[in-house]
Design a protein with these regions (language model features):
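Catalytic-domain carbohydrate-binding cleft regions of carbohydrate-active enzymes
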Residues: 1-406, 452-455
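Accessory, solvent-exposed terminal regions and/or long lumenal/extracellular loops of proteins
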Residues: 407-503
Length: 503
């Protein structure tokens, strides 16, 4: 927490950023996108953000950052239509400037000695380069209503991008600039939106120390499901965000399990850029996918509060079990079997809990993987209850779960309060009734966060904390109460209805 706060606090995304994202195939046209949005609506699937992949550029690899006139003949009209339908647009880009871009001649003096994919590499450490590029982005994207970016191929862990011998006008060594590049691009683009008093939310391939304050979520082309969970968990130790995005699956079971995981992550996204998959690609689990996607929308008040705690207090919204109070299970050491070739020194292997995590203050998520019929879940100290039923699950112990339905194991701590919106495929700026769930038999308190959901006015004090409390008398009777501060505005909630899940 102190590290996150030292670097400016965690990012508070716009409320729409916590909805469901869908990245469309790279060569989609404006009409293709509209049909895709229509199909989401027809099938009752939530959709908040459409991601456009490289084909929106007139040329990509390297990029022009200008619209392809054949696929998007009226980009301003298209962007407005999407906004009118409560759909934000997020644009893919990489840093490398095409000679066919109108910005090419302006940026050329502020680029490196070597190209990448024959594209010029802007020196984003220089204010002059940042201004030239962001002026171009404003003209062709931001001023049209584009809500954010997916910034690819700026992960400079080796010389795959540009060689160590490359030089840049700032004088920063090539190796250092590779490692700074993702952070510098985040800084430059966030500044554009701050100037408009609009929050953005997007994806980035790389970051470095101190980028937790930027509203970008890390991703890459890796696709092992278990590895994705490990990355999601480990990100919390360094104050950054990670998404285990869904792209494709071999079976409907794997499809469902990946979707269930991503809907409890910082960005709930299906990335169909290459193969055109849809949430309903596997018909036998379509209803289950719809259910978890709608639950994602229901959880937005809870998730938004978790991100507010990230911004104000430094608490990661998704975090490793080691960061949960009362969690004390030590890593187990298993002796390796002596083998003259494979293990000549009988090396030991440490088994750690890296397949379950906390979301927000009260929720524990234990994903399932394709082929699993049961799994072990480590419950921290105190009593824990099933999210879906409210039934007692265990107390400070390791339990074995055999799912009776298609849900993944999700638990809530004793006294935990979970605020939920209605299940809806679209949401806007209006107020919605809130279902306030309470689990277990202990009294509970929860500080629900609210603001306008889109601007930086919360930094000036324009936000509200609603105190949700549940008391339990001597006979075990529960009573819920919501206290709104006098004189404070409420943006998102019209009423508070308490539901006691554990009777």
């Amino acid at each position: 927490r102190r590290y996150n706060l030292y670097n400016g606090g965690g990012a508070l995304p716009p409320r729409w950023g916590l909805g469901f994202w869908h990245r469309t195939p790279t060569l989609f046209t404006d009409n293709d996108v509209k049909k895709e949005v229509d199909e989401f609506e027809k099938r009752g699937f939530p959709l908040s953000v459409i991601g456009l992949e490289p084909g929106w550029h007139s040329k990509a690899y390297p990029c022009t950052y200008e619209w392809d006139k054949t696929r998007f003949p009226d980009a301003p009209g298209f962007a407005k239509e999407m906004l009118d339908r409560n759909i934000r647009l997020n644009l893919w880009m990489n840093p490398y400037v095409s000679k066919h871009s109108e910005v090419y001649d302006k940026i050329k003096p502020y680029t490196g000695s070597h190209t990448v994919w024959l594209g010029e590499v802007p020196d984003y450490s220089m204010p002059e380069a940042c201004k030239i590029m962001t002026d171009h982005f404003r003209k062709h994207q931001v001023d049209l209503g584009i809500s954010g970016y997916k910034m690819d191929e700026n992960d400079g862990y080796d010389s795959w991008l540009w060689p160590d011998v490359a030089t840049f006008p700032s004088g920063i060594p090539a190796e250092q600039l590779r490692n700074l590049y993702g952070s510098l691009m985040q800084q430059a683009t966030v500044k554009m939106y701050r100037e408009k008093n609009l929050r953005t939310y997007g994806q980035v391939r790389a970051g470095n120390a101190g980028t937790n304050a930027y509203p970008y979520v890390l991703y890459n082309d890796y696709y092992d499901h278990r590895g994705f969970i490990t990355a999601l968990i480990n990100s919390s130790f360094i104050g950054v965000l990670w998404t285990p995005e869904v792209r494709s699956s071999k079976t409907s079971e794997e499809w469902l399990r990946r979707m269930q995981t991503v809907c409890f992550s910082p960005i709930a996204q299906l990335n169909a850029w290459a193969d055109g998959t849809k949430p309903w690609t596997f018909a036998d689990v379509e209803d289950d996918i719809r259910e978890i996607a709608l639950l994602r929308i229901q959880l937005i008040p809870y998730l938004y509060t978790a991100f507010a705690d990230y911004a104000f207090y430094g608490t990661p919204p998704v975090r490793a079990m080691n960061l949960e109070e009362g969690y004390s299970v030590e890593a187990q050491t298993e002796e390796g079997k002596l083998d003259a070739t494979e293990n000549p020194y009988a090396m030991a292997v440490r088994r750690e809990v890296k397949d379950q995590f906390m979301v927000g203050e009260n929720i524990l998520v234990a994903p399932l993987f394709a082929g699993e019929k049961e799994r072990k879940v480590v419950l921290p100290q105190g009593k824990w209850y099933d999210f879906y039923t409210g039934k007692f699950a265990g107390e400070g112990e390791v339990i074995t779960v055999i799912p009776a339905d298609r849900h993944i194991p999700v638990y809530v701590k004793d006294g935990g309060i979970i605020p939920l919106w209605p299940a809806m495929s679209k949401f806007g700026d209006q107020k919605y009734p809130l279902e306030v769930r309470h689990y277990g038999n202990k009294p509970g308190t929860y500080s629900l966060y609210d603001d306008d959901g889109s601007s930086y006015n919360y930094e000036k004090g324009e936000f509200t904390r609603i105190d949700l409390t549940v008391t339990v008398d001597k006979k075990g009777k529960k009573k819920g109460k919501a206290v709104q501060p006098k004189g404070k505005k409420i943006w998102s909630f019209s009423e508070y209805n308490f539901k006691f899940m554990t009777e």
